[in-house]
């Protein structure tokens, strides 16, 4: 992932950044997957295939969460502008999807963050709080979020 500073929410350090290298992300994802109870749709088999098949024009970012320096949460976020009711434009952050109908034909079931099983009760709420803080209460706004150098 590239540049900037991570913020701490509760006991977590949360950061958002670009995918640096596919092998690096894969190794981190598989390590966390071994410590989580995620569904197939949070597995590297699913996420890795998704990333490998995305066109270069679809940027995805990696949300990473650390607790005491240990990686305890991962997710892909993509920014997309959607049109609702044919007239309302809304910016969205899509979790483990792109936001483009033609690319998200296979929609994941049981979609969620990949979370270390020791943090399933507290980590998702901390991520939501972090995202809401980054949004700064602006409805419909996509945050310009800080990014980090490492997973």
Regions found by a protein language model. Name each.
Residues 1-151:
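N-acyltransferase acceptor-side catalytic subdomain
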């Amino acid at each position: 992932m590239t540049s900037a500073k991570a913020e701490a929410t509760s006991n977590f350090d949360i950061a958002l950044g670009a995918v640096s290298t596919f092998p690096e992300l894969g190794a981190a994802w598989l390590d966390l997957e071994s410590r989580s109870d995620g569904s197939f749709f949070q597995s590297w088999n699913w996420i890795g295939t998704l990333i490998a098949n995305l066109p270069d024009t679809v940027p995805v970012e990696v949300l990473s969460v650390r607790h005491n320096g240990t990686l305890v949460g991962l997710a892909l976020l993509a920014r997309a502008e959607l049109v609702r009711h044919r007239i309302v434009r809304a910016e969205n952050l899509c979790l483990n999807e792109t936001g483009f109908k033609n690319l998200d034909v296979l929609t994941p079931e049981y979609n969620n963050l990949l979370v270390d099983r020791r943090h399933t009760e507290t980590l998702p709420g901390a991520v939501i709080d972090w995202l809401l803080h980054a949004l700064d209460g602006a409805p419909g706004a996509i945050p310009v979020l800080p990014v980090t150098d490492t997973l």
